[in-house]
């Protein structure tokens, strides 16, 4: 029996430093990559207002376009659904005989609720997740998460001697999409939003900013800029 994975993108719109995606790439025969944007009124009561600013919409859209472009270099497209994640995932599970579901660990209450609902509604599917948003994994810490120090200084003193692991490299290849995935919709155009001249979304843009930040030695001014509320050269 073929193993078909469904990867749920959320706040990890990148291929680099994505352990869950690497896991899916190594284990699956086929792979579906999904981003579901839930703008329904019922979602607003759980997540706050679904009315995003034009700039936020533009940034998200640019990030999705960048991810879709990166996936195309692997022979993939990002499946985009404008509906609740649980509904979008369920449709793909049945239409593509999904056997495994992957995601990055999330601290979001709504995202975790959706994950739990999917696990409950699809008990025969294998669910796997990996940490990708933090410098340390819980098992790296010299204390349990429940015993987290109350102040940053105390936390820093306990963890500054821990070696930070290297970011997970992007997969060398991805399993092919299922044969009938071509009919699925990808990222739509967003022509009604005025582009921001200040911030641009996308993994490649993010890497460019990180490289520029450290190449300019800006980390050495951290103590004088860490409280800045905006600006490309502030904080880390």
Residue ranges of predicted features:
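Trp/Phe/Arg-rich N-terminal binding region typifying the photolyase-homology
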Residues: 1-167
